Amino acid sequence: MRINFFVEDMLFFKYIGCATVAKTLYRELGKMDDVEVSWKGYGSPADLVHFHTFGPFAATKRRVTKGRKVLTAHSTPRINEGNIALAKVINRYYPKIYRRYDHIITISPSCHEEVQRMVPDKPMTMIPNGINRDHFSFGEAKRRAFREEYGIGEDDQVVLTVAQLTPRKGLYDFLTLAARCPEKRWVWVGGLPYGAMSKNYRRIKRIKRHPAENVIFTGHIPDISDAYSGADVFLLPSYAETFGLVILEALSCGLPVIARNIPEYYGIFDDQILFFEDNDEVVGLLDETSLLRQKAASAREFSARYDIRSIAAQHLALYRELLES
């Protein structure tokens, strides 16, 4: 069985979540028997091409490829609002694009429902994202190095967010919370992968240039597991997600997680994460030391259900089913 992976991960797009997911899955499949996997390339012979993006380069690949064409729905119309400019215009093309693939892989119950409403005639299978838990694990040396690099004291409480710098990810709430809790250090890892197409691009660039004293914008860093190890609490104030991969990474590193109460997380994280409705609740949760310790103690074990070895096996089973049908 020959499987070709295709994802548009050039330039800053290499930092978007779907590129991370695709590479992790690709590497794990490469360890398995009875399957040959290749990475991108328009001339790579394949029985099945697994797409993780659907931009112009992917469209060209889709037109010239002869094998089965599978797309993972990392992006849906819901997550474009507050994320990129001209979202309403772009969202109109989703049904037409999705119908051009033989099979759709959805990554969460809410993602599955949204795609079903959009293309009810298209066959689809839900397989969640997976992570390499060997890589995403706490390291004391990583913690010290990260804090030293960014001038964070050993006793400082660090609230970490890993996300694109966009309104949809809850950037403005993050800044409001930082102002309300000046005794804590607030670290945001991530950049603007869509460049000038990002929502509120100029405003966010100004904010990044002049952060508050207790706020650190690291931009992209070589290994985000360093940031997870250096933090005490993970916060994701995002208003919409298809899965929430960074939550899973944080849990694997043993962090307690506070996240906005949005439907995308239902059926994925259960009661392992602490949900909030407004900023007042976040402030209160950050002071719940005993509760945060309780969630941290069970975080690593919880993440095992999304170990990449299991997720890769599910993908391989689907590939076989599609090629045999």
For each predicted feature, which ranges?
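A charged, aromatic-enriched C-terminal amphipathic alpha-helix characteristic of glycosyltransferases
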Residues: 17-20, 291-324
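Glycosyltransferase donor-sugar binding loop
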Residues: 131, 162, 185-201
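Conserved acidic donor-binding segment of nucleotide-sugar-dependent glycosyltransferases
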Residues: 270-291
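Membrane-proximal helix-turn-helix segments that form the acceptor-binding/catalytic region
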Residues: 87-104, 205
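A short, active-site helix/loop in glycosyltransferases that binds the activated sugar's phosphate group
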Residues: 99-125, 131-135
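A conserved mid-protein helix/loop that constitutes part of the nucleotide-sugar donor-binding site
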Residues: 20, 157-160, 166-180
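Aromatic "clamp/platform" in nucleotide-sugar-dependent glycosyltransferases that forms part
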Residues: 220, 239
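Short hydrophobic beta-strand element within catalytic cores of glycosyltransferases
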Residues: 256-259
